Amino acid sequence: MENTTTSPDVLERFLRYVQINTQSEDANCDQVPSSAVQFDLANVLAEELRELGAEDAHVAEHAYVCAHIPASVGAEDKPALGLIAHLDTTEVAPGAGVKPHIVHYEGGDLVCGTVDGKPVAMSTAKLPALNDLASEDLVCSDGSTLLGADDKAGVAEIMSLVARIAQDPSLPHPALGICFCPDEEIGHGAELLDIDTFGCKYAYTVDGGPIGELEWECFNAAEATVRFEGQSIHPGDAKGRMVNAGNLFCDFNALLPYVQRPEYTEGYEGFYHLEGVSATVDHATARYIVRDHDAAKFQQKLDLIDAAASMLNQRLGEKHVTVEIKQQYRNMAEIVRDYPELIDVAKEAYLACGVEPQVLPIRGGTDGAQLSFRGLPCPNLSTGGYCYHGVNEFVPVSSLVKMTDVLQELVARFA
């Protein structure tokens, strides 16, 4: 299909957005947004949406940016469609002071930048997809921070679509609900979105990876906090008396199957992921995330955590290990499988733009998981980005433009 806007629009937006720090903070997960800086991008987007004709664009109390675009002539009676992306970036890599730049990639190692005199590079051995990107212009960070394509690429693509419609309102589309959510990276992105006011029958998140990804299955997810209480005794008098909480953690961690760690799993294989641990002789705390697409296997993983704690307590003859499980989200396939038309239409939109759709299980979660269970079926589309959550993150310029084309084709099919 022909581009109806020049590529610099989506690119210019993306380059601006990634320079606004929006890292969420898991330590503040009891408040939304977890970081005040998310309001900085939220306010920019709301103002830009108003400039593009979305008169009701606003930033709600918890940093949700919401706006509505009227339907094109003849599509006024069609159900409203939502397009959703998230404001925040992950805190697992440096995210403030992003300095994006464009690398014309000619093959071999992709060097994003240089830090402390050393190149920050990604090899084709580690990322074979680079072999298909020779001669492409790639947006990278300078190697000292993540880029923020997750999910500011999705934000920019949605905003560029809105700009196209503002320029030519005759482009076919139903009424559109636009939403940019906070705190997706810490699992709270869709919790406080007012679905009734949003007013959409269906929605798509634009939060995937390389262009063509189409996802309607995600993990079942929980967080397990395991606490170990020790008993400190002078090590010279410790025999039969000391309980070392740090060693208890080591024993516990060894009871979880190492082949079910993220670095050994792929596809539909679930995992236990140790996100952090602090330990002394007296006290230790370990935080795991537990993931599996299959609900029964997911429950088995949670049961094994409880069983490991019980085994250690039984060995010690008293309770030194406690487990707290916090459910995070469920596999949205339970809901979305009843709406196959959402998958079919997305495939058609990709194909119309010359992109081969790749239907894959999400090895993670999106805002669409929560929204689907709250009554808004919501598959996930690609953004075009690669290597999320790290300093090697990048996105091809052509993918930013092509995904905007895909969104244009998508909304036309709902008109």
Language-model features: where?
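N-terminal capping segment at the start of a domain
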Residues: 7-35, 140, 329, 389-390
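Flexible, glycine/charged-enriched surface loops at secondary-structure junctions
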Residues: 26-28, 56, 170-175, 258-273, ...
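A non-catalytic alpha/beta surface segment that caps or lines the substrate-entry region
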Residues: 29-78, 82-84, 88, 99
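Buried hydrophobic packing segments
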Residues: 45, 157-165, 249-252, 371, ...
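Active-site metal-coordination/substrate-binding segment of hydrolases
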Residues: 75-175, 180, 200
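Midchain, well-structured core segments that form catalytic/ion-binding scaffolds
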Residues: 127-130, 136-149, 183-306, 310, ...
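His/Asp/Glu-rich mid-to-C-terminal helical/loop segments that flank catalytic regions of hydrolases
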Residues: 243-262, 296-308, 344, 348-351, ...
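Active-site-adjacent substrate-binding region
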Residues: 247-264, 271-273, 320, 330-378
